Structures are given as structure tokens and as C-alpha cells.
Amino acid sequence: MENAKIKNMYDLSQSIAGEYLSQFTYPWEALKGISDFIKKLGPTLDPEIYEKRGENIWVAKSATVAPTACLNGPLIIDEDAEIRHCAFIRGSAIIGKGSVVGNSTEIKNDIIFNTVQVPHYNYVGDSILGYKSHMGAGSITSNVKSDKTLVVVKDSRDSGEEIETGLKKFGAMLG
């Protein structure tokens, strides 16, 4: 399933998680390790650029975080990102350079590449949003199937191939 491979979907130079993602074939393979990756990377970040704002939370000094935003770690907010009023970051999240997490948006277990817009009233869980992705207002990446079975990715553009992800929670892959 060539279309769904990380190397074909994402410009890895556009995320602080590029090296981490490069070890996987498919994006969903990276979801389980986001938390551990952040905990490992965070302490190595340049203290001239990032400040530690709590347990396993690193925020670039150039980022803007509204005082009403709720930040839970592990979390990295990269340079010039904007976290708006009442945004709720539940942890295991990387917010890329120049990205926007808007008001009343909830983020959980995600890699958000640089210059991504998740402007307002969104839920993004167990997802990877590629460089310059934009989710419209009120978008939800529902991350659990209604029948609670494992998620299977189907390639309708090629051979109709199916790959079982081994995951019960999987939101979206936006390239």
C-alpha cells in the first residue's frame, strides 16, 4: 500500500518528529510511541529556544499559549505555534512550528507537523497531520470504531489491499 507509507505521505523535514517517524513504514505504527519519544526528546531541546513548563512539557519561547489553554504532558510545542483560548491538549502531542491549535480544540496523542491549522472546535486524537494540513471548524477525527474492533486501513485507489493496524484507536492521517 504505497499511498499510505510515511515516505509518500509526509515531508519529514517539516516536523521535529521527522527522525522518529522515519523508522516506521506506516503512520499508525508511530502512534503507540509518541509519549516515549517526547519524554526522550524533550530534555535534549535547546534551553535557549524551549522552556520546561511542567512535567514533560516543553514550549518554545516564541510560541503563544493562551492563559486559558490546558496543557498536559508529554508535550512539545514548537516555535511560533499558537495555542488559543480554551484549547485542551491532553498529552502525547507534538505541535509543529507555526501551527495553530484553536479555541475549544482538543488534541490527544498526535503529531502535528509545521504550519498546520486546527483552528477551532476540533477533536484530533491518535492522528498525524502533515505539513500545512488544515482542518475546518468542528472537524472530528473519531478515533474509535463503533463496533470496537481493530482498525483496518483499506486502499481503494490501488489494489483494494487491506492492512490491519492492530489499533483500536486511530484517528486520521492527513498528508
Protein language model features and the residues they cover:
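Terminal amphipathic alpha-helical/low-complexity segments used for targeting or macromolecular assembly
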Residues: 1-56, 61
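A generic, residue-level signal for flexible/boundary positions that often mark functional hotspots
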Residues: 15, 51-53, 65, 89, ...
